[in-house]
Amino acid sequence: MLTPLTAFAGVRLRWPAMMRLTCIGILAQFALLLLAFGVLTYCFLISDFSVIYVAQHSYSLLSWELKLAAVWGGHEGSLLLWVLLLSAWSALFAWHYRQQTDPLFPLTLAVLSLMLAALLLFVVLWSDPFVRIFPPAIEGRDLNPMLQHPGLIFHPPLLYLGYGGLMVAASVALASLLRGEFDGACARICWRWALPGWSALTAGIILGSWWAYCELGWGGWWFWDPVENASLLPWLSATALLHSLSLTRQRGIFCHWSLLLAIVTLMLSLLGTLIVRSGILVSVHAFALDNVRAVPLFSLFALISLASLALYGWRARDGGPAVHFSGLSREMLILATLLLFCAVLLIVLVGTLYPMIYGLLGWGRLSVGAPYFNRATLPFGLLMLVVIVLATFVSGKRVQLPALVAHAGVLLFAAGVVVSSVSRQEISLNLQPGQQVTLAGYTFRFECLDLQAKGNYTSEKAIVALFDHQQRIGELTPERRFYEARRQQMMEPSIRWNGIHDWYAVMGEKTGPDRYAFRLYVQSGVRWIWGGGLLMIAGALLSGWRGKKRDE
């Protein structure tokens, strides 16, 4: 709590020593949080089951990389990771601007420090990962089997890294409101920090989609699950924010758009944590959590959101020079982009929160599924593609390479969505060793069953040979795993691909002597979806690199 006080005092009294003290405080806070996270990680690596959190989420036979993923595999560790990464962003901001005298920078640090203080208070009071038990547990309960996947080593850190960068950008916007001026210079700083945050969030969403495709066993890459939507919502607002800031930093227009989108992105980043960690929404990713945490989490979200909106309503001034729209100008196309993103955001927000509101009113339980989201967002998605084409080919100015790369990624993503949906073929059937089935011109032959014991689970692995016109082109090895510590059975799909086609096999329950249920899929274009996301990130990073060179 001392850091925001020294920051505000330094601005108010114009005392450089206070500003230096603020930077030192933020750097010290990051160092202490890094130490705390390092200690927690060490407890996992040595299987210290005297720590309740370790005993609940780890197992002595886990590999070291899965023990690392287990550090943020539960509520307490993931929140500590989020606070650590937000502190890292704050320390980087403080170090980068340590020589600046503009009040914008200490005010930004003050806003960041207030949010960090609130989050740390929640961690200490309701989410302490270091609570111990004596005598220690003999063995841990193991990591949730759904989370025992390489993608989960990087997926949560990338999401929190993205949230942190976007919260820094929002803090710059809030600091500019406290200062009483949001101009092109402020927008450039906001854009510079929003861009890497958006890139990290995009990478995290891509990894999460890949994990869902590889792990959940239904052959799809996006389920419109509340937890998935929790990361999509700030991504939508942040994407709109980057487009708005591109005009604000260059021409000083769309200031109110940029300010409001920065605040909305902050609110949605906090809402994502509320959705994921409060246990108030049913999710395929759901964890067994104490709903007592929902009240302080919601209070924290409401406090920061209302304070940010109140500050905007109090201090927002004229939105910059008037915007004159003429034909298919860049301004008109970006305004259309902002409106379309806001429409999709509203659709996803309503579909995600409606079940929660319905339940809180005592009307029962319900879920909003993929048909609603697909049908409601499809028209706006098609309009976005039209706007992208117009922005690329109709604008009279030379197309910038970063925008071209990012928009090519959007088009590749859209092509992947369409092709994978149209080409998908599937079949469910029972097979025993020696039997085969043909799907989409490919033959799947169940050859044998391999029983294995690996680390923290035992496995029944089917060997399924894959043939194309009598020529063997590979094999699939779907599994049924049994995790002893949790007494839980999981299906582990097997996927083979050649750059265009994906062959996907899932082995289900035993239905008779040497007979098992199988689900088989053949589809094309799925990898284009993730390739499109990577192109978007490449375009964003290229834009940031060019912008940095231009500023220098």
From Swiss-Prot:
Pfam families: CcmF_C, Cytochrom_C_asm
Phenotype of the disrupted gene, per the record: Triple nrfE-nrfF-nrfG deletion mutants no longer attach heme 1 (covalently attached to 'Cys-122', the CWSCK motif) of cytochrome c552 (AC P0ABK9).
Subcellular location: Cell inner membrane
Superkingdom of the organism of origin: Bacteria
Alphabetical list of InterPro entries matching this protein: CcmF_C, Cyt_c_assembly, Cyt_c_biogenesis, Cyt_c_biogenesis_CcmF, Cyt_c_biogenesis_NrfE
Keywords: Cell inner membrane, Cell membrane, Cytochrome c-type biogenesis, Membrane, Transmembrane, Transmembrane helix
GO CC, one annotated term: plasma membrane
Mode of membrane association: Multi-pass membrane protein
GO molecular function: heme binding; heme transmembrane transporter activity
Biological process according to GO: cytochrome complex assembly
Primary site of residence: membrane
TM segment ranges: 26-46, 77-97, 105-125, 158-178, 193-213, 228-247, 256-276, 294-314, 333-353, 376-396, 399-419, 525-545
Family assignment from sequence similarity: Belongs to the CcmF/CycK/Ccl1/NrfE/CcsA family.
Function: May be required for the biogenesis of c-type cytochromes. Possible subunit of a heme lyase.
Protein name: Probable cytochrome c-type biogenesis protein NrfE
Organism for this UniProt entry: Escherichia coli (strain K12)
Lineage: Bacteria, Pseudomonadati, Pseudomonadota, Gammaproteobacteria, Enterobacterales
Gene expressing this chain: nrfE
